Amino acid sequence: MKARELDVPGAWEITPTIHVDSRGLFFEWLTDHGFRAFAGHSLDVRQVNCSVSSAGVLRGLHFAQLPPSQAKYVTCVSGSVFDVVVDIREGSPTFGRWDSVLLDDQDRRTIYVSEGLAHGFLALQDNSTVMYLCSAEYNPQREHTICATDPTLAVDWPLVDGAAPSLSDRDAAAPSFEDVRASGLLPRWEQTQRFIGEMRGT
């Protein structure tokens, strides 16, 4: 596998080596050695999620408070999604910046979203199936949303068939980025680096 850090520090695109023959294909989705090579620590999986979305469904933006937040190792096993990570860590040199990765069932890429970042994705095809390994179990008291179409963030979501994205009631009612910031819920850069540094033993 090859890992490339995105424009948001702490987020990586992972591209596997795919072996194809007459039977089909095989690839290693995750190895401890490969993960440690870019993240500097092992991935302690506490929950595994699967979502199936129709074309045009937008899920996010979601983040969890530190500690322990919730890192995610995300891939699309069927269909395709436009996957987005946003730097919401106050004090970060890239605060407010976003980056994206196309996850699909052709290149089989994965995105790793470390603790303290916001995440969301837009399904580009019907029955787009996303699997994600999570470093912590879901905790509704510490899980929060940010408006995915907030003009302050200006995420360039692609239109699917020219239609506005379909959101859950919760995501549609998500507060703006500035409102979440004013509420004091956003993580701080130093806090996240200290938390991750402890996992790395540094």
From Swiss-Prot:
Keywords: Carbohydrate metabolism, Isomerase
Cellular component, GO annotation: cytosol
Single GO biological process annotation from the record: polysaccharide biosynthetic process
Pfam family, one: dTDP_sugar_isom
EC number assigned by the record: 5.1.3.13
Record site feature (Participates in a stacking interaction with the thymidine ring of dTDP-4-oxo-6-deoxyglucose), residues: Y138
Keyword Zinc-finger: no
InterPro entries recorded: RmlC-like (IPR000888), RmlC-like_jellyroll (IPR014710), RmlC_Cupin_sf (IPR011051)
Protein origin, superkingdom: Bacteria
Residues binding substrate: R23, E28, Q47, V48, N49, R59, K72, H119, E143, R170
Active site, UniProt feature: H62, Y132
Keyword hit for Isomerase: yes
Subunit and partners: Homodimer.
Family: Belongs to the dTDP-4-dehydrorhamnose 3,5-epimerase family.
Protein name, entry field: dTDP-4-dehydrorhamnose 3,5-epimerase
Native species: Mycobacterium tuberculosis (strain ATCC 25618 / H37Rv)
Classification of source organism: Bacteria, Bacillati, Actinomycetota, Actinomycetes, Mycobacteriales
Gene encoding the protein: rmlC
